[in-house]
């Protein structure tokens, strides 16, 4: 059974499909498919054939064509027009001719049907697809099924990559391209170069229909349905091929204006007469207004204002009513006493009983009972009958009553703050390497306390001073003692000249300052140092009596000359500390007992001394030269003063808030100062920020004896009487808006304790991240 479908078409009649050769059609299809793939990969270019579209859909003439189709909607051929049939009938003379023409038409219909089926199996071009006639029947939806049962929405798509709608170029730097439903990384497939793409284009027959999925990075082969859909979109047609664009118009509502109304029911009588119920209601309201029962809106508002009263109140009146009501409705119960523990038992375990040391500490806190861990001393009895009466019972009950009666109660919200939130986040020590972590070498040779240590500027030799009245020079790499210089008194301090062109060691022993040539290293340098210290320069300036009585310069005697001593500077009081200026020509000494002449500055090239202060501002403990500026740091017991040596004035006074200062060290850039104190603290001062400590570090358990900055690395170390050397990271930034970064790194504890003394001095290697420490155990230890 066939159906006839009438279509109006513009343009000239195109050539029949059944006249196209199969081979040429296949080649044209392949060319069109390659052009289509290029259009998909490069959406900016339009590869549609405008001429073909115009020829197919827009022509000058229009005629009515008739086609034959079966029940499924497949084309069976074109039906000839009535005029052609009349011509054919007139041309046929007998019945035999009519039978032959009908047989030829059936053969042509069969051939045309077979070629159309072959063209349906292959991917057809846009022109071939446009010639397929739509079905005449309208598809009806099954009302028993849901409306969107057969359709896929965006929420139901099977999406492997769950990153969402984001730019995928964010994953260009990573090995993966996203995450699947199991939260596992989707690894990118291997990406080939241009040669691989060229070989794949030649060898892969499906290369033209392969596109890359941006979500997974994999190649996806387009199906025939996808190709057909893309062709329809590129050619500007409706994507759904089953959609009937020219379906018959169904006029659900008439377009003609009806003259007669749909309903012609007359209006009810009540629609134009006044309401009786409203009339009764209005009459009742009028009667209420006359009798004064009903009030207007203004009268109601006035009554409300009168009830509220005035809007002002007593400003200075004490509000006790709220607290009184709270006590009635929401009372705070009295805190309960703690339940008795094991220590309050009449027969407590032995670990709860006090030993002699704990008893002594408990009795020592008699004047400060609130600092005791327990308000009683645990006792042990054999039986409960032997327990005497508690003598403090009445007093404790009385104090409990006072607390309940006099102490106010209030509910406070307890803040649940995590302790880790309060701790500042510091970088890991592994990221701050290098720094010393292990003990590498122990220098043994002294027989008493080693009070001071100093390193040669090149980092090859080490000098140490001890209470055994000796100065020893060591080779750092081997630990061998090269030379020992004996002195008359205890060696308090040693300092190697920081100038690499000179080989001089300043040794403070008793009230004498010895300038020693160690005779190690370069021989030319040793000879140059001897020539410099051999002759005294001429004195053009007359020294005052105040300086002459405080210090005297002299050459060493013959026996001391053999030991290497070249110049002796005799002071009037014992010397505690000596320090060099960065250039190596000036050095300063400290005599705590010297009153207003406690600090002296000596010039080596002119053999001249100066007393910088005329008045005493306290007992001077330590002095330092600024590494860059002409400034002089003077530390007393409690404060630190900074003086300008050129202007001869006080620049700044640093407040340490400590009991006793033990030492100082200045950063190589000169903007930060590190101070050690005997009350277990280290103070970091930012000289550009404030006169108060930027940070106070309590890293040691006992007195901190010495601190030192490294000249090259952002490291500093501290030594204490708890036998520990703590190495810390101290980074100072060039940006003045960024605070210094201080991170404790390593605690090195290998020294032994002698007579309550531990580590006495620390010093850094000038080149390597190595630290030296001296202790009361007569040893020098190297940590690397």
From Swiss-Prot:
The keyword Repeat applies. Residues 112-123, 138-148 have a biased composition (Basic and acidic residues). GO terms for biological process: maturation of 5.8S rRNA from tricistronic rRNA transcript (SSU-rRNA, 5.8S rRNA, LSU-rRNA); maturation of LSU-rRNA from tricistronic rRNA transcript (SSU-rRNA, 5.8S rRNA, LSU-rRNA); regulation of hemocyte proliferation. PROSITE patterns: WD_REPEATS_1 (PS00678), WD_REPEATS_2 (PS50082), WD_REPEATS_REGION (PS50294). Its main location: nucleus. This is Ribosome biogenesis protein BOP1 homolog. Keywords: Nucleus, Repeat, Ribosome biogenesis, rRNA processing, WD repeat. Residues 1-11 have a biased composition (Basic residues). It comes from Drosophila erecta.
């Amino acid at each position: 059974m066939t159906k006839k479908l009438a279509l109006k078409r513009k343009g000239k009649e195109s050539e029949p499909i059944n006249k196209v050769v199969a081979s040429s059609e296949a080649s044209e299809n392949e060319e069109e498919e390659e052009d289509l793939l290029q259009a998909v990969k490069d959406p900016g270019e339009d590869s549609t054939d405008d001429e073909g579209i115009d020829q197919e859909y827009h022509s000058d003439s229009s005629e009515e064509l008739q086609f034959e189709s079966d029940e499924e909607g497949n084309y069976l051929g074109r039906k000839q027009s009535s005029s052609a049939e009349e011509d054919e009938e007139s041309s046929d003379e007998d019945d035999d001719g009519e039978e032959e023409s009908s047989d030829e038409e059936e053969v042509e219909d069969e051939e045309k049907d077979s070629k159309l089926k072959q063209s349906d199996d292959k991917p057809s071009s846009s022109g071939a697809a446009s010639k397929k006639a739509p079905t005449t029947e309208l598809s009806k939806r099954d009302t028993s099924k849901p409306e969107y049962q057969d359709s896929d929405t965006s929420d139901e798509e099977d999406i492997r990559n769950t990153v969402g709608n984001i730019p995928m170029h964010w994953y260009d730097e990573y090995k993966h391209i996203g995450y699947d439903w199991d939260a596992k990384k989707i690894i990118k497939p291997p990406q080939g170069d241009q040669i691989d793409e060229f070989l794949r284009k030649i060898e892969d027959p499906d290369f033209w229909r392969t596109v890359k999925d941006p979500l997974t990075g994999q190649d996806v082969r387009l199906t025939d349905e996808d190709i057909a859909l893309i062709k329809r979109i590129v050619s500007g047609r409706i994507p759904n091929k089953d959609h009937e664009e020219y379906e018959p118009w169904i006029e659900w509502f008439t377009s003609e204006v009806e003259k007669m109304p749909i309903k012609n029911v007359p209006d009810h009588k009540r629609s134009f007469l006044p309401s009786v119920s409203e009339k009764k209601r209005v009459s009742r309201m009028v009667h209420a207004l006359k009798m004064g029962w009903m009030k207007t809106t203004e009268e109601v508002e006035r009554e409300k204002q009168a009830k509220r009263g005035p809007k002002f109140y007593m400003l200075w009146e004490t509000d006790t009513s709220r607290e009184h009501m709270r006590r009635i409705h929401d009372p705070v119960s009295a805190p309960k006493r703690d339940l008795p523990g094991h220590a309050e038992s009449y027969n407590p375990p032995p670990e709860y009983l006090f030993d002699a040391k704990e008893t002594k500490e408990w009795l020592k806190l008699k004047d400060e009972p609130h600092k005791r861990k327990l308000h009683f001393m645990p006792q042990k009895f054999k039986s409960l009958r032997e327990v005497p009466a508690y003598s403090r019972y009445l007093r404790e009950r009385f104090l409990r009553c006072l607390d309940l009666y006099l102490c106010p109660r209030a509910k406070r919200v307890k803040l649940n703050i995590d302790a880790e939130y309060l701790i500042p986040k510091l970088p890991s020590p592994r990221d701050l390497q290098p720094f010393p972590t292990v003990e590498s070498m122990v220098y043994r040779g002294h027989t008493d306390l080693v009070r001071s240590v100093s390193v040669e500027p090149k980092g090859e030799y080490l000098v140490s001073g001890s209470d055994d009245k000796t100065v020893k020079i060591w080779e750092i790499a081997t630990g061998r003692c090269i030379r020992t210089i004996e002195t008359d008194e205890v060696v308090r301090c040693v300092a190697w000249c920081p100038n690499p062109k000179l080989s001089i060691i300043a040794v403070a022993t008793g009230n004498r300052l010895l300038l020693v040539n160690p005779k190690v290293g370069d021989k030319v340098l040793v000879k140059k140092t001897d020539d410099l210290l051999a002759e005294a320069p001429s004195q053009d300036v007359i020294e005052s009596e105040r300086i002459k009585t405080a210090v005297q310069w002299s050459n060493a005697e013959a026996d001391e000359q053999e030991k290497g001593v070249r110049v002796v500077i005799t002071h009037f009081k014992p010397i505690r500390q000596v320090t060099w200026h960065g250039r190596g020509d000036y050095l300063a000494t400290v005599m705590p007992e010297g009153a207003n002449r406690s600090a002296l500055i000596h010039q080596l090239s002119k053999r001249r001394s100066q007393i910088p202060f005329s008045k005493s501002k306290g007992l001077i403990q330590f002095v330092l030269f600024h590494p860059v500026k002409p400034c002089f740091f003077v530390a007393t017991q409690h404060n630190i003063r900074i003086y300008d040596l050129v202007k001869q004035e006080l620049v700044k006074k640093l407040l340490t808030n400590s009991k006793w200062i033990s030492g100082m060290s200045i950063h190589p850039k000169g903007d930060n100062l590190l101070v050690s104190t005997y009350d277990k603290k280290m103070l970091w001062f930012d000289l550009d920020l404030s006169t108060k400590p930027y940070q106070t570090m309590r890293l040691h358990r006992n007195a901190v004896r010495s601190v030192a900055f490294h000249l090259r690395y952002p490291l500093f170390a501290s030594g204490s009487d708890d036998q520990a050397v703590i190495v810390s990271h101290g980074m100072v930034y060039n940006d003045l808006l960024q605070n210094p970064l201080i991170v404790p790194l390593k605690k090195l504890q290998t020294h032994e304790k002698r007579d309550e003394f531990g580590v006495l001095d620390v010093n850094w290697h000038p080149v390597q991240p190595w630290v030296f420490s001296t202790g009361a155990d007569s040893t020098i230890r190297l940590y690397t």
